[in-house]
Amino acid sequence: MDTKARDVAMALAEDARQAEWENVSFTAEVFKGSFRWDLVHPFPAQSPEDRKIGDDYLVKVREVLERHVDPYQIDEQGEYPAAALEAMAAIGLFGMKIPQEYGGLGFSITNYARVLGMIGSYCSNTVTYLSAHQSIGVPQPLREFGTEEQKRKYLPRLARGEISAFALTEPDVGSDPARMGTVATPTEDGKAFILNGDKQWCTNVTDPKTTLIAVLARTPDKELPNGKKIPQISCFVVETAWPGVERVRRSTFMGLRGIANGSVTFKNVRVPAENMIGKPGEGLKIALATLNVGRLGLPAAAIGVGMAFVDDARWWITTRQQWGQPVGKHQAIA
């Protein structure tokens, strides 16, 4: 990378930094040479009231999984049966983190993680589907950065079972957003943006039930007092039914064959100005904050998968007989 490109990338990253952060950071203090044990111990315990909410809901989740979700069928066919989706929507699984005033369940992040753990222990495809929808999909950036009008327009739809996706990565752009090629050009009257570009590796985007996408795109550069310009990345809610939105390819994988991960193109898509989340240039900050929630959801699901592995191993070592006894009784395993 040449010096100019590096400077632009650094300026963009600094401009996207979450400057309004008010809490003391444990990691930042470590780098300063101060080990703030009080920031991590004692670990905050879930309140009895909140835990009961989670306990009661997990009973409903287990019933839906056992009655309506066949993980083997989903992985073999690569699709989610309509009956399974209807059952999940009926108990609010698509709106766990959406506030109650917008039709969701308003769960704490702890209960959300507990639910993902249970679903992950049962069906990895399903937990990926749900997590991508509300950990990094449209509900999360709207919760944190959306206007009241945006929340009332979209969150009830998403809580009822409409699916969303998140579009950041491009064929030539991954961790370097300064090179982003998707562009949102404002119209002369300022009432809309014209969106053009390509995105890939977007989970849920090729699912026909996905109606909304959080899209990151370049908007006009920000000019500094010294005359230099910084690329602006902004975030928009885009409806898949709008003219010019085309889902072009669904990716296939060795595992998780049920996830609808793929590519989407935008050709002269007219996006109303009121569909921008946050302010111009805040898109990268919004994306990073949104991805942080995804980084909590994924390990919660992975813990569930690990628990399922342990259960399977325990069953096997107690049922598999070798040399006159279960293999779990042999010294190498016991």
Segments from the language model and where they lie:
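A gly/ser-rich beta-alpha-beta helix-loop segment of oxidoreductase catalytic cores
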Residues: 163-186
